[in-house]
Amino acid sequence: MTNFEKIIAQNKLKTNAVLATYCVIFAFIGLLVDVIRINANDLGTALFKLMTFQIFPTITIIMFLVAFVIIVVCIQNFSSIMLSGDEYKLIDKSKVLSSKENQIHRLLLELLEEAKLHFEPKLYIIKAPYMNAFASGWNESNSLIALTSALIERLDRDELKAVIAHELSHIRHNDIRLTMCVGILSNIMLLVANFSVYFFMGNRKNSGANLARMILLVLQIILPFLTLLLQMYLSRTREYMADSGAAFLMHDNKPMIRALQKISNDYANNDYKGVDQNSTRSAAYLFSAEMFSTHPSIKNRIQSLSRRVI
């Protein structure tokens, strides 16, 4: 196993730990609301009975069902959401392509062959003045990779290939699916924690229900910061994985490093704030210049790539 394969394996373990934490917090919030709903006398006993289905955890089940429905709706519309608000072009190999369009399509095919993948993501060019890229899609069959026109014009062949390899790695690692699920769980948790305390105010304030209400009040303060930290940690872990995946496919870390440096310098020398109003897409970009970005800093990404041996 190469160092790049090791870092991917290590980051998968970290991802699983974060996902498990999300699911535990999500279920715990639902169970606390159920404790308030049944007006329990003892918190511990009520939680045990709810978890063992001696008492049906109605709110908890509803929360999971709502999350499932929202995920299904997002699956149907995610790609159109990601591409909305911009002039974009599908690279359709059945039509006449420009030299640049031919080039990026050939680069994608080379990477698919190198990775022994049996699917081909749709390839889009977004007309934009900034250099960036993103991947989208719930699974391989509806996946896509989008590159901005500025990125295609300013990167050389190997750098472009590295960027496409990075986005292809996101698809291979199911990062888009993961990001979507975590975002939905976070929003539902925040909504339930913020509003559920007031839904059952008419209940008698038995000690168990009252304690559950107090815990939810504390979570109202803690959850926004906790979910932000978890999302940042998770997303940064996946970016390191995608960088490593790109270098592994390229058999060289230098093209990815050069691409990151050029993109970073482009944002440093130009003010693109407000150019892209699509916040969902902005979070998925290869590079983000925001202070509280879900992406690691370019410096850390380059350091991580530089110390890995292929």
Swiss-Prot record:
This is Protease HtpX homolog. It holds the Pfam family Peptidase_M48. GO terms for cellular component: plasma membrane. The chain crosses the membrane at residues 16-36, 55-75, 182-202, 214-234. Binds 1 zinc ion per subunit. It is a multi-pass membrane protein. GO terms for molecular function: metalloendopeptidase activity; zinc ion binding.
